UniProtKB/Swiss-Prot annotation:
The keyword Iron-sulfur does not apply. It comes from the Eukaryota. The gene is cmaMA. S-adenosyl-L-methionine binds at Y98, H100, V103, A130, Q172, A215, S246, T247. It comes from Coprinopsis marcescibilis. SUPFAM superfamilies: Tetrapyrrole methylase (SSF53790). This is Methyltransferase/ribosomally synthesized type I borosin cyclic peptide precursor cmaMA. Residues 254-373 are annotated as: Clasp domain. The modification N-methylleucine is found at L382.
């Protein structure tokens, strides 16, 4: 059922609180929390919990639904149903879950699926995950050679394929094979950890690097970024360092015989096919940051002028202010969705092309009206050139 077609009175919005306490909350998430009838949350720290309660007094902590006497999957069913019951009562419900609310989170997907099928409006807004933090702290770009992400137990149970020519990120390496819940896990209880290491050794060998990563939560903390070889993780003194919130990152093997250029395809794109496959700089000691090509283009900066196709942002744009309001005020956004033209007509300080763009809501018109010249812009070109630049 289309959740946007004549939805019932209740609605569900799922947002993420991110990993870092308070700092990762998006402006959009905060706006949703402030205007909700009921806020249900499962967050990882007390400071974020206090921040949420400060923004809305009608808050319910779903964490007490966990129990050491039942499986986590049972708790997830209950969490989803708890939120759905408030939606069915006609309330505007916001669910806040730590990290990205759709990454390794079960109750959020379940609640949204059921709500939509029952005719309620239900949406999920993105948040920062542990993997996003990992990319930033370790300097990893997943687009360079691709990235595979697995939950550790799932990878072992289903014998998921590994590709040593790409990045590998493994979640929940500290609770391999655990389906139960405990408020405090002991690293010594990670009895199946050795099976994970055996699988990695089979693919990568004992000397390949593994980065043990934990993203910081409080502003007083620093990220954990410990480097081991796969063989070293067989030692108890190292395996005991792995916590429930630990993530593993394995860099690709370089060079890899599994990677080869599709030169015929490159020629069809009029791209030179003489370059070797690119490997991430931190893991390729032969990659020179200031080679001949880099030096040449850096020198060209001195004489660079903006190209004819570049269009600067309009000064004192009324449309920019209107879009800021729609981004931060959920009630204003609801009014725009109810009657786009009427809302656009009610906004003062807009030019004709800005008003038309606001009423249309289309990306090309909005982007064009925000820039000098007012010509619609197509963002697809930017995506294409970004992809090609990574070859």
């Amino acid at each position: 059922m289309d959740a946007t077609a004549n939805p019932k009175a209740g609605q569900l919005t799922i947002v993420g609180s991110g990993i870092a306490s308070i700092n990762h909350m998006t402006l959009q998430a905060v706006a949703c929390i402030e205007t909700a009838d009921v806020v249900c949350y499962v967050v990882a720290d007390g400071a974020t919990e206090a921040f949420i309660r400060k923004k809305n007094e009608n808050c319910i902590d779903l964490y007490p639904l966990y129990s050491e006497t039942k499986e986590r999957t049972d708790t997830y069913i209950q969490m989803a149903e708890f939120m759905l019951n408030h939606v069915r009562a006609g309330k505007n419900v916001v669910g806040v879950f730590y990290g990205h609310p759709g990454v390794f989170v079960c109750p959020t997907h379940r609640a949204i699926y059921i709500a939509r099928n029952e005719g309620y409006r239900a949406v999920m807004l993105p948040g920062l995950s542990a993997e996003d933090c990992l990319y930033a702290d370790l300097g990893i770009d997943p687009s360079t050679v691709g990235c595979i992400t697995y939950e550790a137990t799932d990878m072992l149970v289903y014998n998921r394929p590994l590709n040593s020519s790409s990045h590998l990120v493994l979640y929940q390496v500290g609770i391999v094979g655990k389906a139960d819940f405990k408020f405090a896990y002991d690293p010594k209880e990670n009895h199946h950890f050795g099976k994970l290491i055996d699988r990695l050794e089979l693919e990568y060998g004992p000397d390949h690097t593994v980065v043990h990563y934990i993203a910081p939560i409080f502003p007083t903390e620093e990220p954990v970024m410990e480097r081991f070889t796969i063989g070293q993780l067989k030692l108890k003194e190292n395996s005991d360092k792995i916590a429930t919130i630990s993530t593993f990152y394995l860099p690709p093997k370089a060079p890899s015989a599994k990677v080869s250029l599709n030169r015929e395809f490159l020629r069809s794109l009029n791209i030179a096919d003489s370059r070797d496959p690119m490997t991430p700089f931190p893991w390729n000691p032969t990659a020179a940051p200031y080679g001949e090509r880099e030096k040449k283009v850096i020198l060209e900066l001195e004489s660079h002028v903006p190209p004819p196709g570049y269009r600067p942002l309009k000064k004192n744009s009324g449309l920019a202010q209107a879009l800021e309001k729609l981004s931060l005020d959920t009630r204003a956004l609801a009014a725009w969705k109810t009657d786009r033209k009427a809302y656009a007509d009610s906004v003062s300080g807009l030019t004709d092309d800005e008003r038309d763009a606001l009423a249309s809501g289309k990306h090309a018109q909005l982007s064009g009206a925000l820039k000098e010249g007012g010509v619609p812009m197509n963002h697809a070109q930017l995506t294409f050139f970004f992809i090609i630049s990574n070859l």
